[in-house]
């Protein structure tokens, strides 16, 4: 069997085991058995449990990022449709690969700084991608000021909020029966785009420029 095929089988088995049992509880024996190979062969290919887990994080992070980017490649989409397409692709991927999402969203973030840093890199790329979508929305919305006028921190802050909300909703959607990717994306769009649309039209929350009222 070609090396890349055997390695993919081992990685698939590792993602399933790590995702369902957690990093600490998962054993190399179980991973080898699920992959249909010997444990020495797993070590030969991927050296240690830590390196295997790191490889799983990187592979699944790359796959998620690719799914989101591929979701918005259709030319001529309006800004809201591009964001909708990206969110739908995000939720579809996390729903279709629940073990991978568990590895990225739960296991990697709670089992050491090295693993958390790998996921943080993926998140930074997502935030950067969403930031680009927001800037594009500003440029193509005639009534709005350029979002750059708000300052980089404001734009990135909105992108951070959207990514964080999407991450939280993916966990909820995967644990709630019968929630589809389109339903999850629609819920987030209904929440986010109404407010974002006002921002693009130059509207601001008035209380943001005045003292918080006391009760």
Annotate each language-model stretch with its function.
Residues 53-60, 67, 104:
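Alpha-helical DNA-contacting segments of helix-turn-helix folds
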Residues 51, 85, 92-131, 148-154, ...:
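Short secondary-structure transition hinges
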Residues 1-5, 138-150, 200-215:
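N-terminal intrinsically disordered/low-complexity leader segments
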